[in-house]
Amino acid sequence: MNTEVKKLINPGRTYVMYYIAKFCFTILTCMETYYIASYTTDAALIPVVLVFIPLTIPTIVDFIMSFLNGIILEKMPHPLGKYTFWMAIGPIVASICYAIVYIRFDDDKTCAIIMCAMIIIAHFFWNIAEITHTSVPSIMTDEVKQRSTLSMLQSSGSSVATFVFGLVALPIINAVNEKTGTLTQGYFALTVICGVLYIIGYLLLAFTIRGMEKREEELVAAAAARKAAEAHNEKAAKLSGKEMLQSFFGNGPLVALTLMQLFTWLCGFVPMGFTVYFFRCSLGAMAMMSLFVSGRSLAGMFAMFLFPVYQKLFKGNKKRMLLTCNLISIAWYFIFYFLRCNVMAYIVVSILVRLFAGPGAMNTLAFYADAATYAQWKTGADSRAFVMSLYTIPLKLALLIRGVLTSAILVALNYDPGLEPSTYKEPFFFVYVLLSGIFSLIAWLIMLFGYHLSEAKVTQMALEIQQRSTNSST
């Protein structure tokens, strides 16, 4: 039996291109994360009654499509390899459509509808392109250390991109707006710049993985031929809807990961929507917010340097690393809520917690890659791309829940910006700190009791899958 698992053909180059692609993609998505709402109301000056069209409808469509993107990736014909094809085409279409979002059309309703339509189209293409990116650790390598490294690079690339975007975005927007004498051209110019970077980053990665994808296509074709021969049915060579369902509902580790990620994203997204309220109303230190955000971004960047140290410390055990790191964060949420230390102490300790707890979450993508290997081993069908596409579902659902919770909480509080900020001190303290701790604790418990794939087991399954393919081709 072959004891060599599949590895990256050129690890060094793949690592660099994978990191660059994630960095460039995050740069573009930061436009939406930080500026789409303020652009709509303060720059495009779209009436409040129409704002829900571009801000809410795309989120709903995005969540629904998150269940279909993996199926589209699997079933849709493509002239090149499916990963190379979507990495090349997806960013181009997405960047063009997203740039149109920041063009101000004269009629308010027309502008809102066009924004909505372009966001939906852009999301469709960049979501599938992102699925191909998140699939790389699962598709291109079975070596658990390489998967962990790719997962770490994805997380680090996102953190660095967010930090860089925070430094350059507003100066570019203001400079272009001042030169053109408009409120919107700066947003459009910045989106074009981010889109070009996004296209370049993904094209570089597409060219890098093409050779590995060809190797994978040969292995998949051999396995499909074996399965079709065994079933005496050509249709058996394709991934069926039943096999897709089995890949999720029959995959305990994947179900646990999905639920864990949902509550992890809720822990991040829900307080993100209340950051301004928390600093203004609960802490009474609005001027300190930028220091807090920048400091945490920097901590996320430097956490990548602790990642290899943690790998050695935990002897490559991803689950133990994640649980230990998350326990640090959970403890800090509850300690701060009940002790109520001063603002500067909160900022400093939060930055340190982000630094020392950050490496744990950098393994998330590697967990999904392991669950994809488990699905292929258990069902015999190559459903890895489909499984990796499910990585985005908890994220989309968390965004949807955040929108509902944010509106519900503000309505329940009868929030009035004209009142004394301290009026809302306790409610926003609860939402930002204690609710985050509760979400994080639930995620921790799900991972502790629901996920049981060890690195040794994943390696053994990968070898068995490889042996099946070898046997089918002889």
Predicted regions and their residues:
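Membrane-embedded alpha-helical bundles of multi-pass transporters/translocases
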Residues: N2-T474
